[in-house]
Amino acid sequence: MGFWSSVGSCLSSAISCVSSVVSSIGGALASGASSLLKVAGPWLGPIGQIAQVIGIALDVLKPKEHVEELGAKAMESDKSMADFDSTSEYIDYIRNDIKLDTEKFEHATEAEKLARLAIGTCITIKGVEEKKGFDIPMDTWLALGKMGMEKLEGKSKDIDAMIEAFKTGESAKDLNAYVDGKLDAKTELAVGDKLADVYRQLEPEASKEAIEKRVIDAQVGG
């Protein structure tokens, strides 16, 4: 009980931290980052890594750029995303015009670390959505985080394929429920078949058993 209480307290402090910089990052980004903190909770780290991987693959971020540093710099900015015509222009501004305060970055509290991670992840997700041309449901990011997609070989290709396959709200919701093992038998079978199709496209030479294992392994809560 004490552990989960401390986690909840840290998340609440991080949300307060996000709210305190709303004048820098803007209301829309502050709302998105706060929602991400509330929904993602312990999966925020993996989701941030996944967003970073696909962000670099799509040239939203440059190689070796980190979502946490992006978020920290956004918190120091005097312009918000609303001041720019596109997310890519906003990211370019943060990249080129805002200097990272390394002293502040290295001595941040746990709440500040969570806040900047959530902000940087949200910015990157918006950039990915801009590149892809559609909004990506939060359930998709949450499911990918639970599945540990950030740990895979060739992960950017896998992540992109999953985003494409589960880009509608209903399919994303079903995927997240599948990962948690909370679907009825009929819907679970349908999602499993869809996952198998994705994995077969990614690995056309893989055996039936290997594909089935990936489908089963995706169900971390089953």
What residue spans do the PLM features occupy?
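Membrane- and interface-active hydrophobic/amphipathic segments that mediate membrane binding, fusion
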Residues: 1-90, 94-101
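Amphipathic, membrane-inserting segments
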Residues: 56-210
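Generic secondary-structure transition motif, activating predominantly at the C-termini of alpha-helices
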Residues: 15, 33, 37, 167-170, ...
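Alpha-helical oligomerization segments
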Residues: 2-10, 17, 197-222
